[in-house]
Amino acid sequence: GEVARTGLHGANRLASNSLLEAVVYSGRASRDIIERWKNGDLGEFIGRLPRWRSEDLGLLIENMPLITDLAALRSTMTQDVGLVKSDYRLERAERRVEHIEKEVSRYWKSCKPTQELIELRNLVLVSKLVVDASKSRRNNVGLHFNMDLV
């Protein structure tokens, strides 16, 4: 539902996943993918996907740095990108998320992925998108409230 970004249920949705959006839009997306696959239209897209390499990657020995990065990401998103925002705090969050992204990228490039590493990498990406969206919104609507826009 959140990924569909339809605005179907307005701005006051909090973090609920709309069953309607989840079912309808995922169904439409899957039918489109299947149809494109049958027609051979996915070749260009598949050709752009990076090749997976794992032969030369080592194992992630310890998860403590990932746990620390996850805690820092959670804290940043809660404190600086929560219900009440400001331009300064969004800039600060952007810098912190970029720093965490660099740390996670080092592990991603040097280690075979673990569930924890994949999840953290995905959370960093979502955090970047949320921060970018919050920075680009120049009016207070629904649950988006920026003190500098009052």
Q: Where do the language-model regions lie?
A:
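Glycine- and aromatic-enriched mobile tails/lids
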Residues: 3-150
